[in-house]
Amino acid sequence: MSEPGSPCFLTHFAVLRDPRQATKVLYPLDEILLLMLCATIAGADDFVEIGLWGSEHQDFLRRFLPYERSIPSHDTLCDVIAAIDPELFKSCFLAWVDGLRTDVPEVIAIDGKTSRRSHDRRKGRLPLHTVSAWATGQRLVLGQETVAEKSNEITAIPLLLRRLELRGALVTIDAMGTQKEIAQTIIEGGGDYVLSLKENWPATYAEVEKVFADPPAALKLQRCQTVDGDHGRIETRRHTMCHKVDWLFSDRRYPGEFQFPGLAAIGMIESETERGGGVATERRYYLCSKKLDVDTFARVVRSHWGIENGLHWVLDVVFHDDLARLRSGHGPANMAIVKHTAMNLLSQAKPITSLKNRRKRAGWNQDYLEKIIQRTA
């Protein structure tokens, strides 16, 4: 599919099957993928903009591939992307990311996001909801799984986890993903978990809340405190870690076994936020399969929220994901992969400026764009 001198990411997508009839193909699939990625990196947000960008940058694109029939129309781009097998596309993305990262992520944050304007009321189609895996330290999207209609994140998260290399990583998930089956999937994959515990597990939550409210001295809790402040807000976080968990009741069906496989520690964070003369307090509890020291626990939980600012916010503000109106076929799911690919490449680019400015620079400077897409993997 790819040619000598073409961007190396294309080699990882070479196994993609072209959904079109071979006798009717005017624009090769690798040319379409290269156009989609380059234009998205350079600032194009929809198929019309991608087509316009391609028409104005044909000489640049021909540095890598022939483009003998010029640039496809935006309708052709839309039809092809909507028809590509999303499962195979995801597998290609995962293979590419595995080559891109240089080490095992310490923390992998799992969280979901809805593309708000991808719904189609006329056809009764709900907005696209995608669960993504984010390497908090490397700031890389590791993978994604589309949540099926009439389903939820609980069914999508295990599918995503089984696609990932989890050995040696800590997986963090909010309360929606605090499920026994998900914990088991992480353990079986060689990883460890830090799962948020809320009232959706009422008996477990009540027991943990009761013990942490008046902990026995025998528990030998570890504690640390952090203070942050900005824009008139001061937040004090008191972290507590308990490595002794045999006081937590077991699964009644299997006496002596914890409800959550591999449970080794329980943590609590009490946050106190001062703003405008008022004070708000909140307590959050976490189930952990690894006996983290309290400072590591504090850092891991804090890093989980990097997926909100580092991924979801960037997709909405830099890539205008919430404004995208793509609705047909597999288009929304496949475009999410294109944006994640563009975002990963931009995240690795230098100099270190905002992704918004890196994206603008790629649109203005073809040599800079070439360096980005030629990132070896």
Task: Place the predicted regions along the sequence by residue.
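A short, flexible helix-boundary coil/loop motif
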Residues: 16, 57, 314-377
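Structural motif
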Residues: 22-32, 276-278, 326-334
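An anionic, glycine-rich sequence signature occurring as long contiguous blocks
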Residues: 198-303
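Generic secondary-structure signature for well-ordered alpha-helical cores
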Residues: 86, 98, 162, 191, ...
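Nuclease catalytic cores that cleave nucleic-acid phosphodiester bonds
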Residues: 134, 142-232
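Conserved, well-structured functional cores that handle cations and Mg-NTP chemistry
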Residues: 8, 15, 22-173, 178-181
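Short amphipathic alpha-helical "interface-anchor" segments enriched in bulky aromatics
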Residues: 50, 287, 291-326
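Charged, often Cys/His-bearing segments associated with DNA-binding zinc-finger transcription factors
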Residues: 1-23, 73, 84-87, 91, ...
